[in-house]
């Protein structure tokens, strides 16, 4: 059953008023694949547009806070924490973005985590596209989530081998 449709098939916001208030956490991931030279410049902080990684972290945090403004029918949530980690994986020529979002509330924070990772990836693309137009944003997904009536979730995808 699709919970965002009423009995007449019209879209509506799900009523979460009767759900228990619990601790919620979700992690999402996005990878940005690029040319090795681009990754080197980015990690060294030598791209013309400035500190790409710091800007991407801020953009991801801002995006998580604005999720309900951008995703129809998404509940506005009182986020207690948004963290953005960006890891370089030279062997795969990519940056991996992992967002972690927490709140105490009646509904999960998966969309906020996905929004944070996605916008951080888009920011990296925007700031590095002058030197690498062939970048690819890939592997955007919820890694895990905790809290709520449906219990915990761990995505079955195996993380990339990070050995160099």
UniProtKB/Swiss-Prot annotation:
<dbReference type="GO" id="GO:0061799">
    <property type="term" value="F:cyclic pyranopterin monophosphate synthase activity"/>
</dbReference>
<keyword id="KW-0501">Molybdenum cofactor biosynthesis</keyword>
<comment type="similarity">
    <text>Belongs to the MoaC family.</text>
</comment>
<comment type="pathway">
    <text>Cofactor biosynthesis; molybdopterin biosynthesis.</text>
</comment>
<feature type="active site">
    <location>
        <position position="126"/>
    </location>
</feature>
<dbReference type="InterPro" id="IPR050105">
    <property type="entry name" value="MoCo_biosynth_MoaA/MoaC"/>
</dbReference>
<keyword id="KW-0456">Lyase</keyword>
<dbReference type="InterPro" id="IPR036522">
    <property type="entry name" value="MoaC_sf"/>
</dbReference>
<comment type="function">
    <text>Catalyzes the conversion of (8S)-3',8-cyclo-7,8-dihydroguanosine 5'-triphosphate to cyclic pyranopterin monophosphate (cPMP).</text>
</comment>
<protein>
    <recommendedName>
        <fullName>Cyclic pyranopterin monophosphate synthase</fullName>
        <ecNumber>4.6.1.17</ecNumber>
    </recommendedName>
</protein>
<dbReference type="Pfam" id="PF01967">
    <property type="entry name" value="MoaC"/>
</dbReference>
<feature type="binding site">
    <location>
        <begin position="73"/>
        <end position="75"/>
    </location>
    <ligand>
        <name>substrate</name>
    </ligand>
</feature>
<dbReference type="InterPro" id="IPR023045">
    <property type="entry name" value="MoaC"/>
</dbReference>
<comment type="subunit">
    <text>Homohexamer; trimer of dimers.</text>
</comment>
<dbReference type="InterPro" id="IPR047594">
    <property type="entry name" value="MoaC_bact/euk"/>
</dbReference>
<dbReference type="InterPro" id="IPR002820">
    <property type="entry name" value="Mopterin_CF_biosynth-C_dom"/>
</dbReference>
<feature type="binding site">
    <location>
        <begin position="111"/>
        <end position="112"/>
    </location>
    <ligand>
        <name>substrate</name>
    </ligand>
</feature>
<dbReference type="GO" id="GO:0006777">
    <property type="term" value="P:Mo-molybdopterin cofactor biosynthetic process"/>
</dbReference>
């Amino acid at each position: 059953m699709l919970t965002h449709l009423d009995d007449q098939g019209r879209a509506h916001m799900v009523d979460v008023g009767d759900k228990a208030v619990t601790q919620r956490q979700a992690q999402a991931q996005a990878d940005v694949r690029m040319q090795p030279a681009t990754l080197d410049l980015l990690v060294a902080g030598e791209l013309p547009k400035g500190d790409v990684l710091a800007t991407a972290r801020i953009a991801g945090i801002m995006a998580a806070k604005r999720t309900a403004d951008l995703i129809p029918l998404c509940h506005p949530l009182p986020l207690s924490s948004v963290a953005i980690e960006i890891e370089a994986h030279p062997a795969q020529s990519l940056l991996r973005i992992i967002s972690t979002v927490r709140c105490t509330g009646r509904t999960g924070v998966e969309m906020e985590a996905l929004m944070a990772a996605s916008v951080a990836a888009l920011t990296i693309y925007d700031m590095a596209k002058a030197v690498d137009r062939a970048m690819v944003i890939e592997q955007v997904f919820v890694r895990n989530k905790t809290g709520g009536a449906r219990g915990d979730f761990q995505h079955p995808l195996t993380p990339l081998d990070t050995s160099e």
